[in-house]
Amino acid sequence: MKLKMFLMSSTPPGSPPGQADTDTAAKTPTTSADSTSRQQRSPAKQPQQTETKGRRYGRRPSSRTRPQKEQRRSRSRHRTRSRSRSLSRVRAVGSTTVSRSRSSSLTKAVRPRSRSRSRGRATATSRRRAGRGSPRRRRSTSRSPSTNTFKRSQRGGGRRGRGRGSRGRRERSSSTSPTPTKRSRGESSRLRGVSPSEVGRSVQSVSAKHTGRLGRLLDEAIDPPVILVRGEANTLKCFRNRARVRYRGLFKYFSTTWSWVAGDSTERLGRSRMLILFTSAGQRKDFDETVKYPKGVDTSYGNLDSL
């Protein structure tokens, strides 16, 4: 009765009871097969659902799988290994090239010496052959050893050169040693006295013309004539520079500009001054007549006992 009631409840309301039994009997094996297939598929879908529940977002269709990642990792490792091997080979080749270049440079550095020696020997033999033939070449060969010896003395003769210099200094000192004795003799003769013919030789006389020793002494007894010029310092300096160029031979000396100072203080009194010295009164007169003094400059005559 319970089975009938269950079947009746499972059949639709509009269908007759006889049909319901046949339908149920026909459908029952299919439902059992469907249930078994669903049960087999459900455990495969459950882990996916659990994974999606654990992750926030589902896996994309373009995302890489584990075998693809492993393949790419193996490829990258293979590439890095090949690169490291190539670098090691390049380094080994570079070291060999450096060693080769060093050896070649050493051989190059050694070879020119042998060439220079062979060249020097060839030049020496050529010079000897040339010396046998012509006299001009003999002269050149005879000059060459002197130059070589001179160069050797310049290069490696430091101590010898110093010794020679010290000898030269000693010789100079020995040659200059007798001069002080001569000076001492001259000083002793001066202290003893001076002959009348030597009097006044070192002193410049006032006049070039004289009549004997007595006339010269009389001319020297006269005081040398002087012109005192007063004015501004710059005007006096300019006048002095012009007179040196234009009026040569009309004067003897020019002094620098100077001024008087008070005894109690260091203040300058009046305008600056300058002295012009002459050998004779006639020279002073000629200078005064020919020279044109600048404006604001005053002159006065005078004589000095000595300079």
UniProtKB/Swiss-Prot annotation:
Mind listing the UniProt keywords for this protein, alphabetically? Host nucleus
Q: Subcellular localization, per the record?
A: Host nucleus
Instruction: Give start-end of the signal peptide.
Output: none
Q: Its family?
A: Belongs to the papillomaviridae E8^E2C protein family.
Which organism is this entry from? Answer: Human papillomavirus type 8
The identity of this protein, by name, is: Protein E8^E2C
Biased segments, Polar residues type: 38-51
List the GO cellular component terms: host cell nucleus
Q: Which InterPro entries match?
A: E2/EBNA1_C_sf, Nucleotide-bd_a/b_plait_sf, Papillomavirus_E2_C
Q: Which GO terms describe its biological process?
A: regulation of DNA replication
Q: Report the protein's function.
A: Plays a role in limiting the replication of viral DNA in keratinocytes. Recruits the host NCoR/SMRT complex to viral replication foci to mediate repression of both viral replication and transcription.
SUPFAM superfamilies, alphabetically? Viral DNA-binding domain
